[in-house]
Regions:
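A residue-level marker of the well-folded mature domains of exported/periplasmic proteins
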Residues: 2-8, 18, 23-279
């Protein structure tokens, strides 16, 4: 099946599901992360394609993003409140920071707004009666990543979190730790300030400093494709390309190129287009 055919299949199935559920005329707000984060462009492509079906059935879709990750939790809560105030009948949103998002989503649900969860926050769904969750099991994905790097000979894995406190990112690195341990290796977590998110130079310097401070680190796993680019640069600057194994969550052209030429060990994809389309 080609990707084009697959998209048609998904579109047909989604349309049928909407018609059966009676939800096809809803006004929906989709809330995602920073406008500076390229990951959300892939999610938005899925949202845009699904919007065509929603609009064809009399509904609307409003796409909202935070400006950055500096004040992430409060910004997300504000966007949830904004969506409710604007009359959204449904909100599709990841729940990265439950302490900020869950109360706002509970209030939205109590007001009759349907909640769809995607990308992060599967464990929080029951708190606001979310209809469904579209995304990966972050813990199992992390375990798989930790096991794979260890199976390739890594003994000490650095797991880099670019947005500390985000549930999905913390869960991924916990999985990496446990997966590495199961396979005879160890992993530790490097949390950097959220204002370094999307900062290639700052992130590369932070990774490089860790590698210099601890020469026993022989693998790095990042939780975003852009961060893997930053790590690749740090590793290259130290003359350790191929010596320090590199892995990441999410795909990009540069990630695939490094895997192809043997300078990156692995990547774990979470299908951002489908997350946006289905949510």
């Amino acid at each position: 099946m080609t990707f084009k055919t697959f998209k048609k299949f998904i579109a047909t199935a989604a349309t049928a599901a909407l018609m059966v559920s009676g939800a096809y005329a809803q006004d929906v707000t989709v809330i995602v992360g920073s406008a500076q984060d390229g990951f959300w462009n892939m999610v938005k492509k899925g949202v845009d394609d699904a919007t065509l079906m929603v609009e064809a059935n009399g509904g609307t879709v409003n796409f909202l993003q935070t400006q950055n990750y500096d004040n992430f939790g409060p910004d997300l809560a504000s966007l949830i409140e904004q969506a409710v105030a604007q009359g959204a009948e449904g909100i599709a949103i990841p729940n990265w920071l439950p302490e900020s998002e869950t109360p706002a989503l509970q209030a939205a649900s109590d007001a009759g707004v349907k909640i769809m969860s995607f990308n992060a926050g599967q464990s929080e769904m029951a708190n606001y009666d979310a209809l469904n969750y579209f995304g990966s099991d972050e813990y199992l994905a992390g375990v798989a990543g930790g096991k794979y790097l260890a199976s390739q000979g890594a003994k000490k894995i650095l797991c880099h979190i670019q947005n500390p406190g985000a549930v999905n990112l913390e869960t991924r690195c916990k999985g990496v730790e446990d997966g590495a341990k199961e396979t005879g290796a160890e992993a530790y977590i490097l949390r950097v300030p959220a204002n370094l998110d999307q900062d290639m130079v700052g992130t590369s310097e932070a990774i490089k400093s860790e590698l210099i401070a601890d020469p026993s680190i022989d693998a790095v796993i990042n939780l975003a494709a852009w961060a893997a680019d930053a790590s690749a640069s740090a590793i290259d600057q130290l003359g350790k390309t191929g010596e320090i194994k590199l892995g990441t969550f999410d795909m990009s052209a540069s990630v695939l190129e490094r895997i192809s030429n043997g300078t990156q060990a692995m990547a774990i994809d979470q299908q951002p287009y489908l997350q946006g389309f289905l949510a």
